[in-house]
Amino acid sequence: VEVIERRTNKLVGRFLHEHGLSIVVPEDQRIKHDILIPPSDTNGAQHGQVVAVEIMAQPTRHTQPLGRVAEVLGEIDDPGMEIEIAVRKFDVPVEFSEAARKQAARLPDVVRKSDLKDRVDLRDVPLITIDGEDARDFDDAVYCEAVELGTGQRKRPGWRLLVAIADVSNYVRPGDALDDDAIERGTSVYFPRRVIPMLPESLSNGLCSLNPDVDRLVLVCDMVIPATGAKAGTVTAYQFYNAVMHSHARTTYTNIWAALQQLSLIHI
């Protein structure tokens, strides 16, 4: 029996220089071997620093694994070091492929007139985004208004609710470079004080983010909800359509809750 292929060929750990030898102690406690670093492969790492290591020779029954320091991340107590360790420990993709970067660079900075074809114009509807205080990208927006449902004696109060999500599909098509990178990532990864986006920043924080006071392409679910009767609070009719919107405000959960509790007045 022999090992055909090993999954781990890169890892993060502490660089130690003791008794004339340089080793890296892996951050991942499931890895029981320390990595021996030849003098020519330390990359200037100092004792105690956190480093990223590339495994050059896997361990055998009689020898330790050999590696080279590919990157010196810094001191263990540097601000944000826990994030740098997590990114490498879990192999979170940080850099986009060259093809994806080139494709993103070719996209426009703003919504063009040609993009509006076959879209409902909702730019006058006061849609708003509601997110956390530290959010940088805004994926969805909402608008709700009181309406009268039915006619004549069958009139009853209700609500019209619009939920709009950024129409990423207008810019990212199946099988293109941006799509390939997005599939590899699967999702944006959120750390305290840092986000590793699924798409390049020009899209994640730009064209595909419903920023205030700019036009954005969206997919909308337009719903009708009775306020009274047996179906009160239930969606009784809905339709989906492509639209263009213009966010009227970037709000947060905190100030919306405060407004609902009438603790403060905010302009929306």
Predicted regions and their residues:
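Conserved, carboxylate-rich catalytic/transport cores that coordinate ions
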Residues: 6-265
